[in-house]
Amino acid sequence: MSTKEKLISHVMKEEPVGSRNKVTVVGVGMVGMASAISILLKDLCDELAMVDVMEDKLKGEVMDLQHGSLFLKTHKIVGDKDYSVTANSKLVVVTAGARQQEGESRLNLVQRNVNIFKFIIPNIVKYSPNCILMVVSNPVDILTYVAWKLSGFPRHRVLGSGTNLDSARFRHLIGEKLNLHPSSCHAWIIGEHGDSSVPVWSGLNVAGVSLQGLNPQMGTEGDSENWKAIHKEVVDGAYEVIKLKGYTSWAIGMSVADLVESILKNLHKVHPVSTLVQGMHGVKDEVFLSVPCVLGNSGLTDVVHMTLKAEEEKQVQNSAETLWGVQKELTL
């Protein structure tokens, strides 16, 4: 008898039940690893699988995380370049793709990443046909559309991380200006994740008090307090971080874990994430943009209808037209 057999006797006859809350992260770059560690530290899954084409980097990252198993409550951490390792995932987070270069717009990345998705998405679908797909790679709105098309999944099982992070940046900056915690500053950024995102000034409130009610000029050129600059900081924020440290990682990783938590814990929380917005806010084309959505066990179950001012609605339509202009040129 082996030491293990002397120590432990097996009671159960049938095969043990596999993972119930398995999460896969595709891509072990900066964003993938920040997402992975954020998910692990929030105890959201009972198995974490990681996939990447860079075998040595993948193996090293998996080992490094496994070495911390004692400090985690996720029993199984695995990784392989073969997608069979992802089988039966409840949720798959796609962070893989070409990295945004300094000064490069998110839209410029697009065809490079479409080609990568043509390999990734069918492999995910093959091994986890019932999973929820969360796209994080940029440009996220277009790539969420691409993932939806390539996967054949119903729209409630495909979402993009969208403006969840933009809204978090927005709330942080508003909090700085008012000396409040971001969670007490209720504010939404919708539309494109990136340069044409739309701040909903009309909905900005603290404890139910509308800030635009106190300052009707808020968000306009004529505002003496120049609140509009905050949105510019949100848009420039990512470029600034990329310029300073070469990439963004921590905030997007935490944002991803925030979304994963709402889904796996069936929280029915409302998040600004990327979904099919055709028919909403006057959008005619088949595009994905961020609007407030309810997230739970089944994925993206509902959309909240925001009351937008005419100019806010126009900005959403402009975003949609920009994205459609790029999308219709894509070869899928």
UniProtKB/Swiss-Prot annotation:
Pathway: Fermentation; pyruvate fermentation to lactate; (S)-lactate from pyruvate: step 1/1. It holds the Pfam family Ldh_1_C. The active site is at 193 (proton acceptor). Its EC number is 1.1.1.27. Substrate binds at residues 106, 138, 169, 248. GO terms for cellular component: cytoplasm. GO terms for biological process: lactate metabolic process. It catalyses: (S)-lactate + NAD(+) = pyruvate + NADH + H(+). Keywords: Cytoplasm, NAD, Oxidoreductase. InterPro entries: L-lactate/malate_DH (IPR001557), L-lactate_DH (IPR011304), L-lactate_DH_AS (IPR018177), Lactate/malate_DH_C (IPR022383), Lactate/malate_DH_N (IPR001236), Lactate_DH/Glyco_Ohase_4_C (IPR015955), NAD(P)-bd_dom_sf (IPR036291). Disulfide bonds: none annotated. One of its GO terms (molecular function) is L-lactate dehydrogenase activity. Its main location: cytoplasm. It is found in: Cytoplasm. NAD(+) binds at residues 29-57, 99, 138. Belongs to the LDH/MDH superfamily. LDH family. Homotetramer. Interconverts simultaneously and stereospecifically pyruvate and lactate with concomitant interconversion of NADH and NAD(+). HAMAP family: Lactate_dehydrog. This is L-lactate dehydrogenase A chain. The gene is ldha.
